[in-house]
């Protein structure tokens, strides 16, 4: 039998516990970085790695230019380090030399970089950009049209090029990969195989073209860390050689999938990172 006084004390403690304000959980980095609508305006600096980092001094790619349009403006992801913006403007001019009006530019980075609330694992340090495979039909699209229009795939059935793929795609991606600022370009393996088959000149740039799933509607350009960003972490260079056999193997594996390998039990998507798990300079950038 519990004494009445003890029973009353236990009841009071339970009531207090139920009404107490819970300890505030650590904010997720994606929510913190995703809340900023503008850059800090400081000196340009890429901080950390492509999938765990941030960016000081990002600049905004203008929504429209003579040879480009930024798409999906509602996402506010048309930000990047100055060298990325310069690269994209230059590549859009190259596109006009092969018969396109210019380029549709997809996601780049957020104003301060960092993890995003939706989508990408990378694109965090202002050095990544997605470029649509769809040749622009107009460079005077309204903001509403840029939300509704979609890119198109250059791959059919996962194993062959679609009717959209063209020599112009090859020339634009080759020009991008030939830029010394570019570390690698991610494309669907079918696109890489088509480039491997068609290339009759210098094949050195093909090393930078990396096959990966989910990149048939756009290609993803990644720049190397630049001088002035000592805290930027480059990836290891791509494997030696042109990588064409590797891309062909990707397609063979789609036709005849090998047994699935074990998943990495330690993998976490960057959207799950707490702010304290980001580089200290990134925590300082957002004032935490």
Provide a role label for each language-model segment.
Residues 2-10:
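Bacterial N-terminal signal peptides that target proteins for export
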Residues 9-19:
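Bacterial N-terminal signal peptides
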Residues 21-25:
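Sec/Tat signal peptide C-region and signal peptidase I cleavage site
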Residues 26-29, 141, 145-288:
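Catalytic cores and adjacent binding grooves of peptidoglycan-active enzymes
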Residues 28-41, 87-118, 186-208:
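Extended, low-complexity, intrinsically disordered C-terminal regulatory tails
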Residues 34-36, 40-106, 168-172, 179-182:
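Active-site acidic/histidine clusters and adjacent loop/turn architecture
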Residues 96-98, 122-127, 177-178, 212-215:
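Extracellular/periplasmic catalytic domains that process cell-envelope and extracellular macromolecules
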Residues 118-136:
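Short, surface-exposed glycine/acidic/tryptophan-bearing loops
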